[in-house]
Amino acid sequence: MTTPQAKPIDSYRKYWASRFGTAPFLPMTRAEMDELGWDSCDIILVTGDCYIDHPSFGMALVGRLLEAQGFRVGIIAQPDWHSADAFRELGKPNLFFGVTAGNMDSMINRYTADRRPRSDDAYTPNAEPNKRPDRAVTVYAQRCREAYPGIGVMIGSIEASLRRIAHYDYWSDKVRQSVLITSKADILLYGNAERALVEIAHRAAKGEKLSEMRDIRGTAFIVPHGWRPDEEWQEMDSSVVDIPGRVDPHLNPYQEIPEQAAEATKGIDPSKPQVIRIESREERLAKRRAERAKTVIRIPAYEAVAHDPVLYAHASRTLHLESNPGNARALVQMHGERDVWLTPPPIPLTTEEMDFVYGLPYARNPHPAYGDAHIPAWEMIKYSVNIMRGCFGGCTFCSITEHEGRIIQSRSEESILHEIEEIRDKTPGFTGHISDLGGPTANMYRLSCKDPKIERSCRKLSCVFPDICENLNTDHSHLIQLYRKARALPGVKKINIQSGLRYDLAVRSPEYIKELVQHHVGGYLKIAPEHTEDGPLSKMMKPGMGAYDKFKELFERFSRQAGKEQYLIPYFIAAHPGTSDEDMMNLALWLKKNNFRLDQVQTFTPTPMAMATTMWHTRRNPLKRLSRSSEKVDVVRDGYRRKLHKAFLRYHHPDNWQIIHDALIQMGRSDLIGHSKHCLIPPTPPGDKAAAVRHKMGAPMNRGKSPGARHPQQGQRAKPAAAVGARGQGGQGGRPGAGKPQAGRSPAKPGGKTSRSR
């Protein structure tokens, strides 16, 4: 099977403006442009984050990549969106505006799981909130149009990427149009998009309009209804469900065999030899590939999915099935009288291209305009290194696969070690501690399908669910070798691993677990079983507790061998689609049995394009073929049940006693109320001595109303009861790398230890 070819991103002839050289920081003001000798910018990037010149921040990576192509790039960071004035700060760009909300979806960044405004923003100086608008991509793009009518506007980033088709929006509780429609942009780039970005910039420099570029992978654009690239293209209609497939006509049972044969040979001269040609398998596959390359799938229109949950779920399933760059087809969705057209996903970057992108001349510091301001996101990642992209886990509550792809893109050892040396030599305040070597996951570095042909033809949503695919290479030796070489660098004293660990993969390599536990865990290691019960786990596409138990046994064994007292910190998610009240009760019993107490909890948050969000909105399961009679999914939407599910995770807290007590009685599980070992809660609220005396004397209790459950802003963190109060030695929590949204998670908070395994 032929691999789709892509032009290397470092092979283009540089634009003429490369003569200006490399800027110490990309300019944010006219004065900075004057210092560089620029009369104008070729491309201006507008972002909802402050500008930090580091590859973990999307605008810095994009800006430096375009600069390496020879373009003059300016940045407008966190502009005042109430008028177009701030968007004129750098003048009119010669080519186009590039618009992004920042490293996170602006709605997730600004609101909690209960739709309450957040009090801080990790991507803003001094964590000041309200520096970006709701749905920032749409607002910024419209202001760019207002500032300079007729200028080309390109949108991208995680917010645009996950809103590229009609999508359910949790914050307005309705299905919204593609962000292309609402933003009035010319073109949308989805995924990390370096390939598309570089090609578009060079074509724009030659005079081509953004709105005319309709043949670039990883893009979306608006076209008249029924538009086709050429006459060879064919449309596959997948806009409805429950329609029978092809039905062949029945043979006439009264027709004689000779008559059937004569009818089948009409027009054939029996006196002439007939050539029978048998196509080889390769020829048949080549023909099929050619047909797929010229096929577009029509998914249900916006107007249909906005009012029909089954069609919404069907559209979501179709999009996710068409996500492998090796076999994905184009998609089209009608919005009114126009179509939103999606080209197939981009070809993943090679190791050489990854090295090129991460080896660009980043200043690795915030822009000087911010002075000594405290920027939490920067403090969190300034001593960390991104070693890979992508995730083949397929967790339904997470959108990494939809954004970065399922194919792992890894950097070379040389590139990673060089960046560690750059941190050591150039980053102020470095004390020898690397806070993380990772990415979307900690341990998928250089893992891939054993057979490239199988990888290109695969249409599975996950390589590890329900079981690890037999074709998946799970060899962790490359990662072990990388860890050892990184530790050996002069000046490096400690390397922690804070990215999420796939423990179901790790147990395939006990040597890796030993290396991790003995050298890279600082007291606590965070992993995420997410749940203990099969019902919700099957909807999450997460492994069962057997893998957790095996990993726990190896973790504890190697910790003892190293003479270290270390703890696993399991994370769980409340109110995920497919979770019943009994499931949460059983999870609480598991926590009590294993002596865990959660000190912070978080409920599921539906984020655009996640499969779990589709379940939450439609009550259907898009992991299976959809029909009007397909299975319904139990969805926790009302406030009482969401509060109850959160309370089960903190069964030990006095504030949650009443709601759990009432629920257990209603569920017929009053046997779990008492002082015996198997009971979940005591018969009286913890700490209420008067109620305990009344209960002992046989007097009725004053049950009253329970206090409102608290809603902390960070992810769930379970502490072993024996370790409560123990101080972890690990680095700070999760990394805010570009594009890591997870439904059911608050955004990563500096110092908040929110990063964990998937």
From Swiss-Prot:
Q: Which residues bind [4Fe-4S] cluster?
A: C391, C395, C398
- Alphabetical keyword list: 4Fe-4S, Iron, Iron-sulfur, Metal-binding, S-adenosyl-L-methionine
Q: Where is the composition biased (Gly residues)?
A: 727-737
Could you name the domain of life of the organism this protein comes from? Bacteria
Pfam families, per this entry?
DUF3362, Radical_SAM, Radical_SAM_N
One MF annotation (Gene Ontology) recorded for this entry: catalytic activity
Task: Please list the cofactors this protein needs.
Answer: [4Fe-4S] cluster
Q: InterPro entries given for it?
A: Elp3/MiaA/NifB-like_rSAM, Methylthiotransferase_CS, rSAM, rSAM_horseshoe, UPF0313, UPF0313_C, UPF0313_N
- Cofactor mode of binding and number, as noted: Binds 1 [4Fe-4S] cluster. The cluster is coordinated with 3 cysteines and an exchangeable S-adenosyl-L-methionine.
Domain named Radical SAM core is located at: 377-642
| SMART domains found in the cross-reference section | Elp3
The annotated region (Disordered) lies at: 698-758
Family that this chain belongs to:
Belongs to the UPF0313 family.
Q: What is this protein called?
A: UPF0313 protein CV_1738
Species of the source: Chromobacterium violaceum (strain ATCC 12472 / DSM 30191 / JCM 1249 / CCUG 213 / NBRC 12614 / NCIMB 9131 / NCTC 9757 / MK)
